[in-house]
From Swiss-Prot:
This is Photosystem I assembly protein Ycf3. It comes from the Bacteria. Keywords: Membrane, Photosynthesis, Repeat, Thylakoid, TPR repeat. HAMAP family: Ycf3. TPR repeats lie at residues 36-69, 73-106, 121-154. InterPro entries: O-mannosyl-transferase_TMTC, PSI_Ycf3_assembly, TPR-like_helical_dom_sf, TPR_rpt. It comes from Synechococcus sp. (strain JA-2-3B'a(2-13)) (Cyanobacteria bacterium Yellowstone B-Prime). NCBIfam families: PRK02603.1 (NF002725). The lineage of its organism: Bacteria, Bacillati, Cyanobacteriota, Cyanophyceae, Synechococcales. It is found in: Cellular thylakoid membrane.
Amino acid sequence: MPRSMKNDNFIDKTFTVMADLILKLLPGVSSEQKKAFAYYRDGMAAQSEGEYAEALENYREALALEQGEEDRSYILYNMGLIYQSNGELDKALEYYHQALELNPRLCSALNNIAVLLHHKGELSLQAGDEETAEALFNEAAQYWIRAIRIAPNNYIEAQNWLKTTGRANLEVY
């Protein structure tokens, strides 16, 4: 039974019923698109409950069915979030990059890549590898700059870090 049918949360049930009604009423929505959306919705529900293996399984099914690049980018992004939560940072980076290939303006993916690169830079610094740390910090800065160009009112902490480290070669401030 799909997760959406097992949910005891009234708001989630209401959303599920409304989404199903909208999908039934929209002309031109194929059964494949409906299935992809159901898997994606179930993946999000499982992810929000910390059921990451189930969420990944649903996202993989959604990815196999979904044709739209933007929708695929969000599926890949959510898979990246799960791998990041599990501490699989390199795998998370792979999924964020795949999401960006499909949707270059996906600010949350740009930000998360920057966060992970910055974290890796901090680890390199702690290990005494200043050269690698500096390269990772510079790469993180480039992703934050891209995100800030798209959404100048977001990522205030990143903007402050860019300014304080002298990496703010950007005219959005």
